[in-house]
């Protein structure tokens, strides 16, 4: 009898003991299963017989009951992939593995991202699965470490290329004889000389192609290595056969193809070297983000200052940062004041004043004051680390546009081998009957011109460069699907407060004398209302001395009453003044004017006498009007969503040029309003910054979070714009359009190259070495085209 297996599964969605009991009951109905579900720990402890019940059965039972299984994500560096057929093969094997929810393998980044159930499989088991099909894998390395590894790989490829080129160059001269009849020294035509030069290229330099081909064929698949190994081996061994015949009849000089095999391998190595070199440039955005980090920190330990590596800083450490130094980690100022350049995060060039208890962000620059900071977030929890993580995930993700290329790549190599065999048969049977050499040359040309690499690189390289360029501009796409969908947007919905406006009310107008302002600010200083803060701040900038208040009373929906230094103050709306019998007829015109401008106007009366008026408004961001104009230039409709009344909303809409307003919307109604717009066949982007925007961000086709907003909004969004600059919204759409256009160009070239190249080779119109050169350069051209995105202007 099989021994019972024990596992623990994390469960999401449980709210009470009844949930746990329901899951437990359904699990225990399975054969040979004993389950215990704990609602507090949100875990199920299960003993089961793997012969009668699989780990997947357990997961499906929990999900059918209406709850979720908590998966973990593994990120692996995959070693040994050469083309799209490799990445597709690994992806298929991983997705068929028990316990794996979803796996994606990216040829460009050479990464695998796997969502899996830890109760059913493990990272070690996943690595073994990859190794079993002929590749290698390891837990993902840090960007800096991987970058240095890539440099070593590039150097190794260059050495191989140089050796191969030195050996193949003399053989290339023999082509001049075949093509143009040019006379060269007889040594170059000697079969032994050609054999000695071609053999190390074929079996030492080119051994990697044999290893790759063997591993793939052993596992029932085929990749680029199979095509190269078949094509070059056919040329090499046919030449060897002709050479052996020559040994027995030295009077007849054989027609050898040693130069074909050696030059083909050299050209393919050259293409792979250029491709690797270009691919390293696609990760520059990540390297540049990493370079923003401080390398070390000045920490206060045992009452002594000491410099330590950044990685040694722990939460709770006290850091001393001097003028001109980078803030090492996220933290809170506990001593000192300064101004900080946060442009790397917000794009705002003006330094921000910081005082005690203010938060600071790691990697920003301290400008002019010494400060002591308590570390609150270190390592992978810092703001910059989060940004790097988002960019990495986006660069490693797949866009839906890639699906067709993935499907074709899976069948590509077997089809090409079939076409090569068919070409050989047609040539030897019909085109040049009984002539072996022309048939072989045409078949070799078909094998070596076909390039699955270009298909595999077409989308991910563009995604990598596009998301990297966007990140440099403060735009974070969370994945390839989001960068693809963003270019389809035709309507942008903007939340008003904190998105269109600064989110902080200020006094815009004051009509009254100094005493009225003094009493007004004195009464408001104890209030927590945002409008009160605006009034107090205004009075302080005017150097008004605040007085003590007695008998303060807030009247809901009306205003406030207070007694200050024996004077009775009344502040509020028209109705309040009428209730208190204050004559306000002189204020009507100016108050109406303020309200039409979207401002909140408050009347001031002292001892029953009207003394003035204050207008407070949440001011519009400087960039809002320009951003909306740019969206209109892109033929995108702009809608404002706000809880304000119609008149206030319309005033702001008129100021910034917004097409449509949806006013008096409660926070919980925002998602429903987005859904209503979607029923009109609109592709909606919702832009917001607050907790109450999160449901609407999720409902929208694309949710865009303002980076200065709450973590909840940022988590719910598909795109994050760092800082509060709305100009980044049209830039995000432009980046998406440029990236998708670039992907389409790459796919057109990759498909077009193979569709045109294979028939031309089959017709015998291409020499194998020319076909090989075309194949080598096709993938390089795709990567080079993607690199053009680095120069796109947003």
From Swiss-Prot:
Binding-site residues, Cu(+) 1: 16, 19
Keywords on record: ATP-binding, Cell membrane, Copper, Copper transport, Ion transport, Magnesium, Membrane, Metal-binding, Nucleotide-binding, Phosphoprotein, Repeat, Translocase, Transmembrane, Transmembrane helix, Transport
Gene3D superfamilies recorded: 3.30.70.100, Calcium-transporting ATPase, cytoplasmic domain N (3.40.1110.10), Calcium-transporting ATPase, cytoplasmic transduction domain A (2.70.150.10), HAD superfamily/HAD-like (3.40.50.1000)
Binding residues for Cu(+) 2: 83, 86
Catalytic EC class: translocase
Tagged with keyword Transmembrane: yes
One GO term (biological process): copper ion homeostasis
InterPro entries assigned: ATPase_P-typ_cyto_dom_N, ATPase_P-typ_P_site, ATPase_P-typ_TM_dom_sf, ATPase_P-typ_transduc_dom_A_sf, HAD-like_sf, HAD_sf, Heavy-metal-associated_CS, HMA_Cu_ion-bd
Keyword Transmembrane helix assigned: yes
Pfam families: E1-E2_ATPase, HMA, Hydrolase
Membrane topology: Multi-pass membrane protein
Signal peptide location: none
Localization (cell): Cell membrane
Chain ranges of the HMA domain: 5-70, 72-138
Residues holding Mg(2+): 689, 693
Ranges annotated as spanning the membrane: 162-182, 187-207, 224-244, 250-270, 411-431, 438-458, 747-766, 770-789
One GO MF term: ATP binding
Catalytic residues of the enzyme: 495 (4-aspartylphosphate intermediate)
Entries under CDD domains matching the protein: HMA, P-type_ATPase_Cu-like
Reactions listed under catalytic activity: Cu(+)(in) + ATP + H2O = Cu(+)(out) + ADP + phosphate + H(+)
Family: Belongs to the cation transport ATPase (P-type) (TC 3.A.3) family. Type IB subfamily.
Name of the featured protein: Copper-exporting P-type ATPase
Provenance organism: Staphylococcus saprophyticus subsp. saprophyticus (strain ATCC 15305 / DSM 20229 / NCIMB 8711 / NCTC 7292 / S-41)
